[in-house]
Amino acid sequence: MTMDGKNKEEEQYLDLCKRIIDEGEFRPDRTGTGTLSLFAPPQLRFSLRDDTFPLLTTKKVFTRGIILELLWFLAGDTDANLLSEQGVKIWDGNGSREYLDKMGFKDRKVGDLGPVYGFQWRHFGAKYKTCDDDYTGQGIDQLKQVIHKLKTNPYDRRIIMSAWNPADFDKMALPPCHIFSQFYVSFPKEGEGSGKPRLSCLLYQRSCDMGLGVPFNIASYALLTRMIAKVVDMEPGEFIHTLGDAHVYKDHIDALKEQITRNPRPFPKLKIKRDVKDIDDFKLTDFEIEDYNPHPRIQMKMSV
């Protein structure tokens, strides 16, 4: 928030959506919907200080879905049914019988997405079989490595987590869109703030669905940064979002035009209610969103 009370951080998102609609190049895409696209627009930056949580206010965002999906990633899960049973249907399309058959996964059960995000974060390099197999101790646990480096060598320039594993693409229902995150610790000057170091996260996202996906991704990685900061005893700093192919699906244009006319309100606050020490101990009930006052929900169809 700026001194004049305007939410400039949400405005940067809305300005980019408008620019894509006005100036974007038409591109056909794998879903058959078609998009307007810009490549490598300016980064989006969001402060996470003072418990600020960059949850868009110009439409109501499915906060519970964001939290449950991230917990699902962190658990290394790849079974979309585990989310669907909790009312989070965002992966149902990519895990449907029709979609899996179309992708050549006729022997997989419905919901088995293959070695997607959570598997790569927690078991990079392990041999994937099914979503029901136990991969404990297999592959590289990138998330645990990130946390260890933050605790032992916070100046390290290799505090990185990647979901991009070309060796596994032929097993994935959908290759990752948000693929590469780097964490950076800054140290306060003497007498500044709480005195604790600040943790920031930079995300590179190759494919950026501005209408549906990007609002989710912003909040999800802001939440991830908050959770990691909690377990390493740091303060949250900033989330920086680097976008590759930033696109608006043609059937989202009218909805986004409506959203752009709305005035952003102050971002809510995110409170973590327990003193969690282990990244694997977080639960849905640990999080509380305060002062979220969004405009009404805007329906947009997901292209699969």
Swiss-Prot record:
Task: Tell me the residue numbers annotated for binding (6R)-5,10-methylene-5,6,7,8-tetrahydrofolate.
Answer: 209
State the activity regulation. Answer: Inhibited by 5-fluoro-2'-deoxyuridine 5'-monophosphate (FdUMP).
Q: What is its EC number?
A: 2.1.1.45
Q: Belongs to which family?
A: Belongs to the thymidylate synthase family.
Q: Which GO terms describe its cellular component?
A: cytosol; mitochondrion; nuclear periphery
Self-association and partners: Homodimer.
Question: Quick one: which gene encodes this?
Answer: CDC21
Q: What does this protein do?
A: Thymidylate synthase required for de novo biosynthesis of pyrimidine deoxyribonucleotides. Required for both nuclear and mitochondrial DNA synthesis.
Query: What's its top-level EC category?
Result: transferase
Entry GO MF terms: thymidylate synthase activity
Reaction catalysed? dUMP + (6R)-5,10-methylene-5,6,7,8-tetrahydrofolate = 7,8-dihydrofolate + dTMP
This chain's source organism reads: Saccharomyces cerevisiae (strain ATCC 204508 / S288c) (Baker's yeast)
Localisation per UniProt entry: Nucleus
| Gene Ontology BP terms | dTMP biosynthetic process; dTTP biosynthetic process; methylation
Task: State the pH dependence.
Answer: Optimum pH is 6.8-7.2.
Q: What NCBIfam families does UniProt report for this protein, alphabetically?
A: PRK01827.1-3, thym_sym
Q: Which UniProt keywords apply?
A: Methyltransferase, Nucleotide biosynthesis, Nucleus, Transferase
Principal localization reads nucleus
Which superkingdom is the protein from? Eukaryota
Q: So where's the catalytic machinery, residue-wise?
A: 177 (nucleophile)
What InterPro entries does the entry give?
Thymidate_synth/dCMP_Mease, Thymidate_synth/dCMP_Mease_dom, Thymidate_synth/dCMP_Mease_sf, Thymidylate_synthase, Thymidylate_synthase_AS
Q: What induces it?
A: Transcribed in a periodic manner during the cell cycle with maximal mRNA levels occurring just prior to the onset of DNA replication. The promoter contains 8-base-pair motifs (ACGCGTNA) called the MluI cell-cycle boxes (MCBs), which mediate transcription regulation by SWI6.
Q: Which residues bind dUMP?
A: 30, 157-158, 206-209, 217, 247-249
Q: What is this protein called?
A: Thymidylate synthase
> Which pathway does the UniProt entry assign to this protein?
Pyrimidine metabolism; dTTP biosynthesis
